[in-house]
């Protein structure tokens, strides 16, 4: 009884077979069918290779949300060279809460030569070229994000020659931690001293003729320091044409969480607007000579995530390519073969012309029976 039920079940399953097998003796092969099959297999191979390259590629997904972190500190990474001796300049930060962060908390003053060596000039030229391309091709930023920690650092290479020239500039580099409110990082004449109403600089002790705020920004970033990330002001160089010149940078900082297959970092992107002018109180251009970077933080936070096509989606797309090409080429081959047969082979005039009479074995004839040519039945 069980065997009988099993046979019934198997026969029922066989009847439900959606892929019936045609015996090879009933399959007709042709040169045109082989040509179409060759084209189909070649197309499938090319599309499969292209689809696999798409599967291997990644893209950056951007999401936006309100930044709810107000209590943490903001890190500012600085590497700026000013064409003045270190004893003549001072750097510090003053925010909207009147909180002063002195440069002694994390910055190093290093005497150096302002002019770059040949190798350093080549580095600066390449960095400026990348900056110009980034301003035109914004999608290149995705490539930079994905290459983080994958390439070498973008820091200024050390001087390869032992210059006998005495130091005529000051390299200010390091990092500071400030409150997450708008502030002003500035480099001006004289060392900073605390003041009940803010702070002041001892500019009176410096000769006015020694003022020269020509400067080079080798690196400026906010948040966690991520090597190989190029920031908007990296490689910037400004030459002062007057002793009383002020350089201003208005910066909008956007908190950014970066998640790639290489790293995860809490960093910050920023945009900048530059302005420079000569201080002339008689002409109404007031201010103080120096370099001023006024930054403000955006209330929005950007999450940048590197994404990859899931395997199931790749598999479905691959099945669609194979099945679609098989179905389409089969249909096109059938239509083409039908058209060729109509024009050249089957339905020529006279192929179905009836004969006048049909002889039978008993000797009589039938003139009304249509008969194909070469047919004796």
From Swiss-Prot:
One GO CC term on file: endoplasmic reticulum membrane
Entry's Gene Ontology BP terms: endoplasmic reticulum to Golgi vesicle-mediated transport; retrograde vesicle-mediated transport, Golgi to endoplasmic reticulum
Transmembrane segments: 34-54, 320-340
Compartments, record wording: Endoplasmic reticulum-Golgi intermediate compartment membrane; Golgi apparatus, cis-Golgi network membrane; Endoplasmic reticulum membrane; Cytoplasm
Keyword annotations of the record: Cytoplasm, Endoplasmic reticulum, ER-Golgi transport, Golgi apparatus, Membrane, Nucleus, Transmembrane, Transmembrane helix, Transport
Lumenal-facing ranges: 55-319
Tissue expression: Ubiquitously expressed.
Positions in the Cytoplasmic compartment: 1-33, 341-377
InterPro entries: Erv, Erv_C, Erv_N
Recorded superkingdom: Eukaryota
Lipid bilayer topology: Multi-pass membrane protein
Assembly and oligomerization: May form a heteromeric complex composed of ERGIC1, ERGIC2 and ERGIC3. Interacts with ERGIC3, the interaction is required for the stable expression of both proteins. May interact with EEF1A1.
Described function: Possible role in transport between endoplasmic reticulum and Golgi.
Similarity comment: family membership: Belongs to the ERGIC family.
Protein name: Endoplasmic reticulum-Golgi intermediate compartment protein 2
Organism lineage: Eukaryota, Metazoa, Chordata, Craniata, Vertebrata
